Amino acid sequence: MKKLFASLALAAFVAPVFAATQTVTLSVPGMTCASCPITVKHALSKVEGVSKTDVSFDKRQAVVTFDDAKTNVQKLTKATEDAGYPSSLKR
C-alpha cells in the first residue's frame, strides 16, 4: 500500500513538469475592421488551455499563450477559422 501511495504521489508531482506554456504568433489576414480583433480574441480565449491573447488589427496577427498539454496550434487555428477568420502559424 505504501508503494502504491508513493507511486501515485510521485506521478502527481512529475506530471506538471511535462506541461509547458508556449507562445505563438498567428497570422490572421482576414481582419478588415476594428471589431474583427474582438471576435478573434473571444474565439481564442474560449479554447481550453489558452491563458493570454493579444490581437492586433494593424499587424493582422494574434499572439497566443497556452498550455501545450491542453491545446495546440491546430486547435487555435480551428477556433479562428470557425469564427470566420482563417489563420496560420507565423514564422
UniProtKB/Swiss-Prot annotation:
Cross-referenced Pfam families, in alphabetical order? HMA
Where is Hg(2+) bound in this sequence?
Answer: 33, 36
* Cellular component annotations (GO), alphabetically ordered: periplasmic space
Task: Say if the entry is tagged with keyword Cytoplasm.
Answer: no
Q: What are the HMA domain coordinates in residue numbering?
A: 22-88
Q: Which N-terminal residues, if any, form the signal peptide?
A: 1-19
| Keyword tags | Mercuric resistance, Mercury, Metal-binding, Periplasm, Plasmid, Signal
Q: What domain of life does the native source organism fall in?
A: Bacteria
**Gene3D superfamilies this protein is in?**
3.30.70.100
InterPro entries documented for this protein: Heavy-metal-associated_CS, HMA_dom, HMA_dom_sf, MerP, MerP/CopZ
Gene Ontology molecular function: mercury ion binding; mercury ion transmembrane transporter activity
Protein's cellular compartments:
Periplasm
User: What quaternary structure, including any partners, is listed in this protein's UniProt entry?
Assistant: Monomer.
- Family of this protein: Belongs to the MerP family.
Function in brief: Involved in mercury resistance. Acts as a mercury scavenger that specifically binds to a mercuric ion in the periplasm and probably passes it to the cytoplasmic mercuric reductase MerA via the mercuric transport protein MerT.
Q: Report the NCBIfam families cross-referenced here.
A: MerP
Name of this chain's protein: Mercuric transport protein periplasmic component
Output the lineage of the source organism: Bacteria, Pseudomonadati, Pseudomonadota, Gammaproteobacteria, Moraxellales
